[in-house]
């Protein structure tokens, strides 16, 4: 793709997200979603092949359906209130339809089927954008309407997402699908706390984006896409492999690492609001995520035959791509937990 055209498309995608996040008018918010959707399609098809074409088509159809539901919700609200402003209280029916539209855009269960297929069909940089940047606009809309969200609907979708995000990733050998199911589970955690403490949902989103970006950047340094290539990476780039494994443990929510912080704070907040069954169910189903990350670590690092590293290293190494962002992101992915006393100010 021509670099100038790619820059224009990327700018349009970012501008669309910015319009959604800053808009106080439902029509301009819908325009922002459309700009973002139409701009990301060429990014998903940057490396053109039948798989990326299929993935882009699935993504387009899903997002177009969600945009249609968004306009339906806005129209219902307009008929009842006569207002276009996002700050006005929503009609209950409009609130439910709008929540379903944003759930479809985020990939929450039961609208999660497109996420693994689309992520698997595109190359790693596009997958990174899909699982990080594309979550910002729908989450900002849910943040704005959080006082009017139907609590039962949101909790049902959240717990389903956490469970399906864990079950779906159990037998995966493709790392992009693993990250997709991890994304579904993390979205479930974010939306579970949205009605009680929206700021905490944004904290969870920030930590999720840091962890996912770190993981994808380490995959991109050596074009690692399968469990097999991850196990081969150990002899070629032991440091990068260690970063991948530690970041995966953090994504799973292992206590000493950064990924444990949002889960801990969300469970604490839910129990303060006299909700006991939901956080218990969420904590138990989150173990499924940790299990499939542990399975990846076991198959890639702990099943190697004992040998000196220098005896099995390749004599001819490919040039690895370096990135300046990887070092600070790795630190953030593993060491945010000591900052948690300051984050208690969010409560």
From Swiss-Prot:
It is an enzyme of class 7 (translocase). Pfam families: NADH_dehy_S2_C, Proton_antipo_M. It is a multi-pass membrane protein. GO terms for cellular component: mitochondrial inner membrane. The keyword Mitochondrion applies. It is found in: Mitochondrion inner membrane. Signal peptide: none annotated. GO terms for molecular function: NADH dehydrogenase (ubiquinone) activity. GO terms for biological process: mitochondrial electron transport, NADH to ubiquinone; mitochondrial respiratory chain complex I assembly. Its EC number is 7.1.1.2. Keywords: Electron transport, Membrane, Mitochondrion, Mitochondrion inner membrane, NAD, Respiratory chain, Translocase, Transmembrane, Transmembrane helix, Transport, Ubiquinone. The chain crosses the membrane at residues 1-21, 25-45, 59-79, 96-116, 122-142, 148-168, 200-220, 240-260, 274-294, 325-345. It catalyses: a ubiquinone + NADH + 5 H(+)(in) = a ubiquinol + NAD(+) + 4 H(+)(out). Belongs to the complex I subunit 2 family. Core subunit of the mitochondrial membrane respiratory chain NADH dehydrogenase (Complex I) which catalyzes electron transfer from NADH through the respiratory chain, using ubiquinone as an electron acceptor. Essential for the catalytic activity and assembly of complex I. PANTHER family: NADH-UBIQUINONE OXIDOREDUCTASE CHAIN 2 (PTHR46552:SF1). Core subunit of respiratory chain NADH dehydrogenase (Complex I) which is composed of 45 different subunits. Interacts with TMEM242. This is NADH-ubiquinone oxidoreductase chain 2. It comes from Thoopterus nigrescens.
């Amino acid at each position: 793709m021509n670099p100038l055209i790619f820059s224009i498309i990327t700018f349009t995608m970012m501008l669309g997200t910015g319009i959604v996040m800053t808009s106080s008018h439902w029509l301009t918010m819908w325009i922002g979603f459309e700009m973002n959707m139409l701009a990301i399609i060429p990014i998903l098809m940057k490396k053109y092949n039948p798989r990326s074409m299929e993935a882009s088509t699935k993504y387009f159809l899903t997002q177009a359906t969600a945009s249609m539901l968004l306009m339906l919700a806005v129209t219902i609200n307009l008929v009842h209130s006569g207002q276009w402003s996002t700050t006005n209280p929503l009609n209950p029916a409009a609130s439910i339809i709008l929540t379903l539209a944003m759930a479809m855009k985020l990939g929450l269960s039961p609208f999660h089927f497109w996420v693994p297929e689309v992520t698997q069909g595109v190359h790693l940089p596009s997958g990174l954008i899909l699982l990080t940047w594309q979550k910002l606009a729908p989450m900002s809309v849910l943040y704005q309407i959080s006082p009017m969200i139907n609590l039962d609907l949101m909790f049902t979708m959240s717990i389903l997402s956490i469970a399906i995000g864990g079950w779906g990733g159990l037998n995966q050998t493709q790392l992009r699908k693993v990250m997709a199911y991890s994304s579904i589970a993390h979205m479930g955690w974010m939306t579970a706390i949205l009605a009680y403490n929206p700021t905490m949902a944004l904290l969870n989103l920030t930590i999720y984006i840091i962890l996912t970006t770190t993981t994808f950047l380490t995959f991109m340094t050596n074009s690692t896409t399968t469990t097999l290539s991850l196990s081969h990476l150990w002899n070629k780039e032991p440091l990068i492999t260690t970063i991948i494994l530690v970041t995966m443990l953090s994504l799973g929510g292992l206590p000493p690492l950064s990924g444990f912080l949002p889960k801990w704070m969300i469970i604490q907040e839910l129990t303060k609001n006299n909700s006991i069954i939901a956080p218990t169910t969420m904590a138990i189903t989150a173990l499924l995520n940790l299990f499939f990350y542990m399975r990846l670590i076991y198959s890639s690092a702990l099943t190697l035959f004992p040998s000196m590293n220098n005896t099995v290293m390749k004599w001819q190494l490919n040039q690895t791509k370096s990135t300046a962002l990887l070092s600070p992101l790795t630190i953030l992915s593993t060491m945010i937990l000591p900052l948690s006393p300051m984050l208690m100010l969010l409560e």
